[in-house]
């Protein structure tokens, strides 16, 4: 089954990469913007996905406004991160996990960037969650499953099959909540998924599936206490994207008529940048929203970060959003042409721009602030 996935998707990746390179301006004579130190004390890791199939994922490090590019390679001169970094999380005080999708590994590092070990038997690995003792990783392989990894040994100790092409995963009070996408529907001959699988984390058995009625639960998923913010990407033709906010305590949910492609949480709110794409028009449309918790009241824009709105609207391709839990600073990345180096913007708690950083990496997408 795995060989079938790898051969098919290798063909898709090669074709897609050539199309992307042909369609996007490479902007060889790129103008480098000076990176001025921020007023924030944040120590921030920025995971750049790179281009699928190009083996060029990397991590940039922002240390109180000072940018260190290719940080992982500098800390590990004999290693490179791999192909398509897809997620990064803090497992515990001494361990960080990075899902490197097309390299089929989960890379572990210390907070200082030194590589520790890797789990290398979770093919097509996607998103990560942890309870401190175990790491949970979604995988598109073998019909879609979740792997449970002992963080002491870095070995897979159990698995559980879920829906097709599972994406986001969250741990809450002994249970795992997994957003199933069915994203390979057109290629694999199955329908898009609209369910969230609920697993017992101890036994790794699926307890139920919550049908949200919204297809293709693909993209970033944020957790704020008992609430999850899940993006429904639609089918890119007739079915519009949506946002699903799930209460993991009651297993009730509410659907909003805007996408949450890139989302994060701070305080009692979700902050959302939605990206809507239509094959009918070939056009991306971007929106911003804020969702209050627990009232689930939605607002246009990014509330107290409203001053950042004009800058975000000027970005070519917003590709990630994150608010530091330590400083309250808002970080937004711009992937630009997807085949060129990107930018990361830093805004303070009032949305005033504090810095703009030229990242020597493609598609900066995932953030982690270190304590």
Question: Where would I find each of the regions flagged by the language model?
Answer:
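C-terminal motif of bacterial Sec signal peptides marking the signal peptidase cleavage site
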Residues: 20-23
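Bacterial N-terminal signal peptides that target proteins for export
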Residues: 2-12
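Predominantly soluble domains enriched in secretory-pathway, periplasmic, or organellar proteins
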Residues: 25-371
């Amino acid at each position: 089954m795995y060989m079938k996935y790898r051969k098919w998707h290798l063909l898709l990746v090669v074709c897609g990469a050539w199309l992307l390179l042909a369609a996007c301006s490479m902007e060889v004579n790129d103008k480098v913007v000076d990176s001025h130190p921020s007023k924030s004390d944040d120590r921030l890791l920025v995971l750049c996905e790179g281009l699928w199939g190009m083996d060029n994922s990397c991590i940039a490090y922002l240390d109180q406004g000072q940018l260190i590019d290719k940080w992982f390679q500098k800390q590990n001169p004999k290693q490179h991160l791999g192909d398509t970094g897809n997620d990064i999380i803090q497992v515990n005080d001494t361990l960080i996990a990075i899902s490197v999708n097309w390299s089929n590994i989960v890379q572990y590092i210390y907070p200082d960037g030194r590589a520790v070990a890797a789990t290398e038997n979770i093919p097509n690995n996607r998103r990560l969650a942890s309870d401190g003792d175990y790491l949970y990783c979604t995988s598109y392989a073998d019909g879609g499953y979740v792997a449970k990894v002992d963080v002491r040994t870095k070995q897979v100790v159990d698995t559980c099959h879920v829906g097709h092409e599972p994406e986001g995963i969250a741990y809450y009070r002994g249970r795992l909540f997994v957003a199933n996408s069915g994203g390979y529907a057109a290629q694999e001959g199955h329908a898009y998924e609209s369910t969230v699988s609920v697993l017992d984390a101890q036994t790794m058995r699926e307890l139920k599936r919550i049908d949200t009625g919204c297809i293709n639960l693909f993209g970033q998923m944020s957790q704020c206490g008992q609430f999850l913010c899940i993006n429904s990407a639609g089918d890119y033709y007739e079915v519009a994207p949506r946002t699903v906010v799930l209460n993991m305590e009651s297993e009730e949910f509410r659907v909003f008529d805007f996408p949450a492609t890139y989302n994060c949480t701070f305080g009692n709110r979700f902050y959302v940048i939605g990206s809507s794409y239509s094959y009918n028009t070939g056009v991306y449309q971007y929106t911003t929203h804020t969702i209050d918790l627990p009232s689930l009241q939605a607002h246009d824009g990014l509330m107290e970060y409203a001053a950042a709105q004009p800058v975000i609207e000027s970005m070519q391709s917003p590709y990630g959003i994150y608010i530091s839990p330590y400083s309250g600073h808002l970080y937004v990345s711009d992937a630009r042409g997807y085949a060129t180096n990107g930018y990361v913007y830093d805004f303070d708690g009032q949305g005033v721009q504090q810095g703009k950083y030229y990242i020597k990496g493609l598609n900066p997408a995932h953030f982690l602030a270190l304590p």
